[in-house]
Design a protein with these regions (language model features):
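Membrane-proximal alpha-helical signals and transmembrane carboxylates
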Residues: 8-352
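Positively charged n-region of N-terminal signal peptides that target proteins for export
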Residues: 1-4
Length: 352
């Protein structure tokens, strides 16, 4: 990653960008934290240090100003370097920014051509000093660490790059969702998410609902469904999912095909009858959790799944609210046996 950044910077320098600034004049930014208090922006940035012995060395700087441009400039003047944000990894917004200065902040980030658009954007109200301290104690670049946490397929998180987020923000047919970070037991976690209604914060959902959101968006994250059977515990792990939507007569028909395997089995005899019952229980679990999440969206008129766009494409009519919509769920659970051997069943897949 460091080599890639160096190559990109070199290209800019050799093609006349930055008014022929040298490498020593550029501060490569990994993290930006934006808060808004008392009519001022409070900006914190993490700058990568060019240390051979410690590639994860970084420094944290904070300043404030009346405008974002003024605040970025203040930090640049403090360190006497040009802030290079083309490869920024993560931008954190506080709820103060969401509720008071979201439009202004997004307009600035989008219009400034020296800020990249492939970074992850999250929300957090925790003290940025505590967040950076906890992550730097792991000898990690803070912005890169948060981005890696989000994008890792084994972490059930909301993975939203800025370019996708801004398209949703400008889209009247779909509501936004963003990861919500907080410190839990001295760890910075991303187990929650904020969902919006017409660009206004509406609700915070937990990791169980994030799992359902990813499933409904065909996002193959590490997702587990737990059920109980005859006093034993069963964990079904999703390997891949295929979700489709169809609108008919004020109904959104949702078809979910899930392929996965039993990741953990506790005191359960895996004969053919039990396997069929376990798959049925897993299907019921997915159905109940999905229905619960859809009801949250419907009751709060949150169109995080883009139902208005589906309806518009079918009818050319703009829907003001999704509260009157009905949902039909058709869930198919497929047991993939590539990683598990069942002696009494010869077929590769069992479907119910």
């Amino acid at each position: 990653m460091k080599k890639i950044i160096l190559i990109i910077i070199t290209l800019f320098l050799t093609t006349g960008c930055f008014n022929y600034l040298s490498l020593n004049d550029i501060a490569v930014v990994s993290l930006v934290h934006i808060d808004y208090q008392d009519n001022k922006y409070i900006l914190t940035v993490e700058i990568r240090e060019n240390e051979k012995d410690n590639p994860n060395a970084s420094s944290i700087y904070t300043n404030q100003g009346i405008t974002l441009d003024n605040t970025f400039e203040n930090i640049g003047l403090t360190i006497n370097k040009f802030l290079y944000l083309v490869d920024v990894d993560t931008i954190i917004l506080t709820e103060n920014v969401l509720n008071q200065k979201l439009e202004t902040t997004l307009d600035y980030i989008t219009r400034e051509n020296y800020i990249g658009n492939n970074f992850n954007i999250i929300v957090s109200n925790d003290d940025i000093k505590k967040i950076t301290k906890l992550i730097k104690e792991k000898n990690k670049i803070v912005g890169a660490y948060i981005k890696e946490t989000i994008t890792n397929d084994y972490n059930n998180t909301i993975d939203i790059k800025y370019n996708k987020f801004i398209k949703t923000y400008l889209n009247e047919y779909k509501d936004m969702i963003l990861p919500f970070g907080k410190i839990v037991n001295n760890e910075f976690t991303l187990n929650d998410a904020i969902i919006f209604n017409h660009n206004k914060e509406s609700a915070i959902i937990n990791n169980d609902y994030i799992k359902i959101y990813n499933l409904l968006n065909n996002t193959n994250k590490y997702s587990l469904f737990k059920t109980n059977y005859n006093g034993g515990n069963l964990i079904y792990r999703i390997k891949d999912v295929n979700t489709k939507y169809k609108y008919e007569n004020n109904n959104i028909n949702i078809t979910i095909d899930i392929n996965g395997n039993f990741n953990e089995i506790d005191n359960i005899n895996l004969n053919k009858d039990n396997i069929e019952k376990l798959i049925t229980l897993t299907k019921d679990s997915v159905y109940n959790e999905t229905t619960s999440f859809l009801n949250i969206l419907k009751n709060n008129n949150i169109d995080a799944l883009g139902f208005k766009k589906i309806i518009y494409n079918k009818t050319k009519n703009k829907l003001d609210s999704i509260k009157e919509l009905d949902y039909n769920l058709d869930i198919k659970i497929i047991l993939d046996r590539e990683e598990t051997i069942f002696e009494n069943i010869g077929a590769k897949k069992n479907e119910i």
